[in-house]
A protein has these predicted regions:
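A charged, well-structured terminal subsegment
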Residues: 113-121
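STAS-typified acidic loop motif
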Residues: 2-43
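Short, ordered loop/turn segments at secondary-structure junctions
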Residues: 89, 112-113
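Short acidic-hydrophobic, aromatic-tinged amphipathic segments that line or gate anion-handling sites
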Residues: 107-111
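Amphipathic alpha-helical interaction surfaces in cytosolic regulatory modules
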Residues: 32-106
Length: 121
């Protein structure tokens, strides 16, 4: 199986009623080779950004090294007071995220609108 290169697209989105949110849209495989794409893109987000959506709907494969990168990013976000909401995970990865404790740092949502609305809670 050939690994699909990780792509991360950063964009701004207006979420009603909370306002501007930064969205990181992941695509491809997230593995140890994804460090620059995942952490590099996250580090480009200003500390003043307080709401981040993570979109995993384009992710086909995520291994333990990739999960470690996501956890590292979420810990860094937590330290700067950034809130993260997550959506688009395939059911298998939802179970894995829950088992490894990622849900301490984020809530998993079924879709983008639900994740967006969670910032107002």
């Amino acid at each position: 199986m050939q690994e699909k290169m990780t792509q991360v697209k950063m964009e701004e989105k207006e979420c009603v009623p909370v306002g501007s949110v930064t969205v990181l849209r992941f695509a491809g495989d997230i593995t140890s080779a994804s460090k620059a794409a995942v952490l590099g893109t996250y580090q480009g987000i200003p500390d003043t950004t307080k709401r981040i959506l993570l979109d995993f709907s384009g992710v086909d494969y995520l291994n333990s090294s990739g999960i470690a990168l996501i956890i590292q990013m979420m810990i860094a976000a937590s330290k700067t007071g950034q809130r993260i909401q997550t959506f688009g995970l395939k059911p298998h990865f939802q179970k894995v995220f829950t088992m490894v404790g990622i849900t301490k740092y984020t809530t998993l949502h079924p879709d983008e609108n639900t994740a967006c609305a969670a910032f107002s809670a």
